[in-house]
């Protein structure tokens, strides 16, 4: 464990460049059916369509339904969250038929401790010390959520917390690293099943990476100042357990980590998560987190915030429109590389491929 801590210090903030379109994960010609499919699709996509895939939005005052449907038809939306009924999800997915490349949406929701059937809060589930019971609750949640047309759950929440003042204590599994790590893997496997493309499986988006439950003073979104030994020994293992269990997605936390917000933390999202831990999935910002880089004092404006997030390794931007607004301008100005956009787009398309949505966008909606 100490070797990991030292390695974390030495790596710094550098990471390998993202892959160019048309290459496999090793930088060589695509070797698998999945890589070939994605490379072929990306070769036909415009940059506007690639950036559209990075947009995760919900229907609401900021994104009225009719306007959002028009954006879907124009290829400007990658996924939807907080739409939870079959008729509404189907109506949104239907708009994809009118887009140029017909890239399906995925639909996500906070399925935390049940969907239609409500189980005890996560802290209560953890108090059972019964992994089988927790697995059954997550499997039932997956069955019910997928039956409503959902593809992804923003769950499990595996943030270790040892400060009862924090307002989200009830959403996690508590203070014990071993127990939280155990239940983290249990829930991921129960949600995703043996075949993520199955109609009754949903993708797990483990959250909040990282250290969200260690916010100073128990104040949500606050700073975290923590040594690497404590980080690796006490707080990071539950996220690692989710990655090892095959979690398809990771939601990035809103807090800072030793002065750098997680949403702009290249060491966290690229060097640790992808290079050391071998995570191959999708990274998603928390709600409005890219814009909040300004409030954290790291970014001077929306343009800077967008650049910092995409270069750190955040694939999808949740609900604000910073990526769609600023990525084209940053690319034109040479402030980001084409590889940054291609990497993020590839991760989104890979998640949709794994969910079976290219084979059948309606697989969780019935006929």
For each feature predicted by the language model, list its residue ranges:
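Glycoside hydrolase catalytic-domain context in secreted enzymes
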Residues: 19-367
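Bacterial N-terminal signal peptides
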Residues: 5-16
